[in-house]
Amino acid sequence: MKCENCTKTECSKKKKTEENGEILDAMALADGEEKSEFHQLAEAKIFLSDCLACGNCVTSEEGAKIFAQNQKELFKVLNRNKKCDSSLHKLVVASISPQSVPYFAVKFHLSVCEASKKLCGFLKSLGVHHVLDTTIAADFSILETQKDFIQRFRRQTQDEHAFPMFASACPGWVQYAERVLGDSVTPHICTAKSPQQIMGSLVKGYFASSKNVSPDKIFHLMVAPCYDRKLEALREDYYTELYNCRDVDCVLTSGEVMQIMEQQNISVKEVMEFPLENLFGETSCVFVRHEGTSSDGYLAHVFRHAAKELFDMDVQEITYKALKNKDFLEVSLEKDGETVLRFAAAYGFRNIQNMVLKLRKGKFHYHFVEVLACPGGCLNGKGQAQTMDGKVERALLHEMEEVYTRVPIQNPESNPHIQALYEDWLQGAESQKTKQTLHTKIVASAQSAARLDMKW
């Protein structure tokens, strides 16, 4: 089985090109590291991140930069802070993805809240100065996605690309759309940044200003469930030339952080507990999540908002209908006997392939689709819930889903700091600064144009 649009006789995950794979393998062996995202492809299986790691999409330069995002990069900064003159020190800030915390909860045999405190304590014991909750970044991403949907709905008669609208939070999906699917798909993707990159903007922008620190004097670490987040952090539009720094300097997966704990032979019981901070220096013992799926619930939030904003309907309960498989779900809204909204969630490469095929045939009649590269969503990220040969650790995934559902829900609109940041820092919810800070450009690459005529 091969990726759609792939012209190779053998997958580059098995037979790597000299330019990309062999160089990276040599680097890995020289450093005594595992090969991480460049592992062998599981037989008869294709994952979206495997496709993205093919030499046709990821250049050797990108591959080297992805590989360099490891614990050595973190410890290089931490050790420099201990040994060098204070003028060369960096403020080390770690942002924790909400989907990573359930992984540590299961591994530590603790509640999500307790696990977040242990994780915070461990990172601080290494020399990290601030460990931040990223809920506010997901709040902004959801709210901006809601706004984008309403605007598209109101201009749909003038814009042939208004619908379906695809969520943009998954970097694997966005990279695949830009580099392979091209401009037949990219105009349909929401321009709101992912929570990771909004957090990057907040840390290198608002947080840096509040601490009176230049953005290039902050080392921003992101702990995430997914290897594709490493590639996302390298996007050109997330780099600031003025300060010669990226919004997110290093991404470590949940599994990589756990490896650091194991290598240092640290017992969870020995780790002191510290609550996560927010951008304002406040701490809370309560860990919250968003309604809907474990991937921040874009479908649920956009659906409820659209029902109220467009049709003045309050949706009390959302009913998900599984179609061909459990990773393709449908939600619809009826008014006066007519279906006025049709939403879907499409997880995994196979469902993405089917979705795009129907879109090109004009048979994909949805208003909004929550698209994720990993089957089962972000909890099933390859950086925490999958083995190196691509097999899902189902028991672990099930436990993570169980603990995640016990976390209390908070709607983005309920976050008291959101409106303050819109008004005081972003100069208004509709300002140019808001668009520059919270949105990105989804652009088809030159490579994709050559592939549009290929058969599906």
From Swiss-Prot:
Gene source species: Xenopus laevis (African clawed frog)
Gene: narf
Name listed for the protein in its UniProt record: Nuclear prelamin A recognition factor
Matches recorded under Pfam families: Fe_hyd_lg_C (PF02906), Fe_hyd_SSU (PF02256)
Family according to the record: Belongs to the NARF family.
GO cellular component, one term: lamin filament
Domain of life of the native organism: Eukaryota
Primary localization class, coarse: nucleus
Localization terms from the record: Nucleus
Key words of the record: Nucleus
GO molecular function terms noted in the UniProt entry: lamin binding
PANTHER family: NITRATE, FORMATE, IRON DEHYDROGENASE
